[in-house]
């Protein structure tokens, strides 16, 4: 068996490199087609996300697929030079490739460790390969094991339950302390940059359905609002939006507060005493800190939220050794299972060969004795032959099983095939 991976990720390739090595849906389909033409009996799974591009190739023997074959495949399918692909894609083989896949699926190799999206992306990549008829017993086994490993890490550690980004902490931990649910609450988000986009994603996932994006550029506000099913307004209408808001969020890059304390106090007075949660995620701050003293107003600023992120990060780091131990156990288990499956046919053929020789020798012996032994004596002779055969076979078979359990049976496996003439099909 051979398993090889070539790939790059945010760890080792800048975004401009990853962009040139990423695959569109059509390019993925073309890659599977070309791979099938070149390697009819080999297997391939292709994982392409915004943070990583990885190809997992497998074959029944080391000669069936080389790492250079995968590099050539990527270069041809993406119309890139071979040197460019080779210089920016890391090669992993065997155990290293399996361990890497398990780390990826368990979200231990992600930009944000513990984020849940990557496991579904790994599953989708396998499903695409399966639909293209490019999977087989090796990729099936290793991706099944990766899925099992990821679920163990999720259930046996708390590494996935700690939010690390400011928007995720703000929406996932702070908002539930003030509102039982976001559905029906008027959410006014100021800004239309990356922080605003990430915050909107968490808001939508949290059930928010009454959103408004306010920005100096109405065009940018509208573009972001359209993506998330929100209203769009210019900064000219900010005061009116504040009066309506239940949740007010600041993510702009303005150098001064977008509304001063006295203006906010006047607007809050028009709200009829309704509770308002203000999340100031901006640097510099979008809101004067004194608005937190207003009646019914709960203000959380970037430093409050960053402190929670840092606490969560420390808690996640404490869980890392436990998660890594699970990865190591599953990698060991995968290779033990693989080796045991490989040794099973050899052990069976060895037993069959010994039983055949034993039966032939018993038949020859009883023929020479020419009926001079009774049934009881023949049974004793057969038992003696059985004991002799078992004692002779036990050491090599036990050694083979032990080596398989340790993942090192290849050398002994080949030696037994050669010594006992068991053939490659075993």
From Swiss-Prot:
A GO biological-process term: protoporphyrinogen IX biosynthetic process
Keywords: NADP, Oxidoreductase, Porphyrin biosynthesis
EC category: oxidoreductase
CDD domains linked: NAD_bind_Glutamyl_tRNA_reduct
InterPro entries linked: 4pyrrol_synth_GluRdtase, 4pyrrol_synth_GluRdtase_dimer, 4pyrrol_synth_GluRdtase_N, GluRdtase_CS, GluRdtase_dimer_dom_sf, GluRdtase_N_sf, NAD(P)-bd_dom_sf, Shikm_DH/Glu-tRNA_Rdtase
Positions annotated to bind NADP(+): 191-196
Active site, per annotation: 50
Reaction equations catalysed: (S)-4-amino-5-oxopentanoate + tRNA(Glu) + NADP(+) = L-glutamyl-tRNA(Glu) + NADPH + H(+)
Residues of the site described as Important for activity: 100
GO molecular function: glutamyl-tRNA reductase activity; NADP binding
Pathway recorded for this protein: Porphyrin-containing compound metabolism; protoporphyrin-IX biosynthesis; 5-aminolevulinate from L-glutamyl-tRNA(Glu): step 1/2
Entry EC number(s): 1.2.1.70
Binding site for substrate: 49-52, 110, 115-117, 121
Pfam family, any one: GlutR_N
Keyword Oxidoreductase: yes
Its job: Catalyzes the NADPH-dependent reduction of glutamyl-tRNA(Glu) to glutamate 1-semialdehyde (GSA).
Comment text on domains: Possesses an unusual extended V-shaped dimeric structure with each monomer consisting of three distinct domains arranged along a curved 'spinal' alpha-helix. The N-terminal catalytic domain specifically recognizes the glutamate moiety of the substrate. The second domain is the NADPH-binding domain, and the third C-terminal domain is responsible for dimerization.
Entry's family note: Belongs to the glutamyl-tRNA reductase family.
Subunit structure: Homodimer.
Additional remark text: During catalysis, the active site Cys acts as a nucleophile attacking the alpha-carbonyl group of tRNA-bound glutamate with the formation of a thioester intermediate between enzyme and glutamate, and the concomitant release of tRNA(Glu). The thioester intermediate is finally reduced by direct hydride transfer from NADPH, to form the product GSA.
Matching PANTHER family: GLUTAMYL-TRNA REDUCTASE
NCBIfam families: hemA
This protein's name: Glutamyl-tRNA reductase
Gene expressing this chain: hemA
